Amino acid sequence: MSVKATVALVGRPNVGKSALFNRIVGQRISIVDDTPGVTRDRIDGKGEWSGHSFNLIDTGGIFDEEDDILKQVVIQAEVAIDEADVIVFVTDGRDGITPADEEVAATLRKTKKPVLVAVNKSEGNYDQYAMEFYQLGFEQVISISALHGTNTGQLLDEIVELLPEQEYEELNYHEDDIMLSVIGRPNVGKSSLINKILNKERLIVSNMPGTTRDAIDTVIEREDQKYVFIDTAGLRKKSKIDERLEKYSVIRSIKGMERSNIALLLIDVTKGILEQDKKIAGLAEEKGKGLIILLNKWDAIEKDGKAGDKYYETVRLELPSVNYAPIMFLSAQTGKNVEKIFPVIDKVSKEHSKRITTADVNRVIEDAVNYTPPPSKKGKRLKIYYATQVRTRPPTFVLFVNNPELMKNSYKRYLQNQLRRAFGFEGTPIRILERVKQRR
């Protein structure tokens, strides 16, 4: 497996970062509005240009409207320096250079990473707008219109020219090694959990360069199985950005999950399920990762005989999209139940890689359809001719049907539940895709 390079968009609110993000990613997955500081849920996407692909993050998406603008731009620049291979500093040509732009520039000048200045909203006067922004001290300045697409091709040419010559290759990992990311909000105990695992598992532990960058993975060998904890160095170092900006944890979680098969989502049980917990859980599902939910700081909870059941039900209620994920109660601080993580990891890894025979898949789908036929849509009814599994990690099934548009989400969930009932799939999302059955 290889890791794509990362490009970060930086800039004050309302300079057009969202419009440029959408232009590069090629689909409208973020809100574009003229109100300064409009926030978005989606902050990552995939960019492709001239045969190169890269991860794209919009650092502006990690802020709320009420955040101070100067605080925003400085932290954006720090996030970009921390996470990106190439930084695109987006400005507004019509406004000229503002104090916030100067703050960003001052921070970015401290890095050795390549910085491109994209002077947006330069319609009608591209050369003149670009000249002013050379004052910020960067060599490459390009005037663009993200809205109309003018010169965005030139910008992308420059971006791919600056990307690392090769994708970061993972070293010495075997397909059977279990790749794990520890994800969650700041201060939920991620570094404590890693340290406790390493202290408890007095086994073969080695630190490996996870990529040709400076990420360090920790490899544990246990009963002939290798477990690779991704970027443990990054987890152990306290990020000043994390401390000041909780939403930065979403970017960190995205990056950790890119290389993992299974994500361990750590939640502080004393705080309950917060919005960032929900976002990070949703990312794990969206990216098709196996998932284990770890309720940390269980030692700090006053317990009666029903405490475990109560918290279990709360998690299921608050995180319905990942109701397949096993839930564990533990204390990273005291080590309680930490040693029980590995058998659950083994189980989820097996389920994530599970393959079902075509005959068994069709038997379950046929029984499900006979028991509850597909609902009609505009007077037409979905017909499912046959099904087969086409991928693992996550398990993915294709249904050959008369018309994919007749598949309702509610019926797809019903079929997913029937597959789970028959085959398990604990801890892993499953995908169902529809294809038109070709006539002979």
UniProtKB/Swiss-Prot annotation:
GO terms for biological process: ribosome biogenesis. PROSITE patterns: G_ENGA. GTP 1 binds at residues 11-18, 58-62, 120-123. It comes from the Bacteria. Residues 5-167, 178-353 form the EngA-type G domain. Keywords: GTP-binding, Nucleotide-binding, Repeat, Ribosome biogenesis. GO terms for molecular function: GTP binding; ribosome binding. The keyword GTP-binding applies. InterPro entries: G_ENGA, GTP-bd, GTPase_Der, KH_dom-like, KH_dom-like_a/b, P-loop_NTPase, Small_GTP-bd. Residues 354-438 form the KH-like domain. Associates with the 50S ribosomal subunit. Belongs to the TRAFAC class TrmE-Era-EngA-EngB-Septin-like GTPase superfamily. EngA (Der) GTPase family. This is GTPase Der. The gene is der.
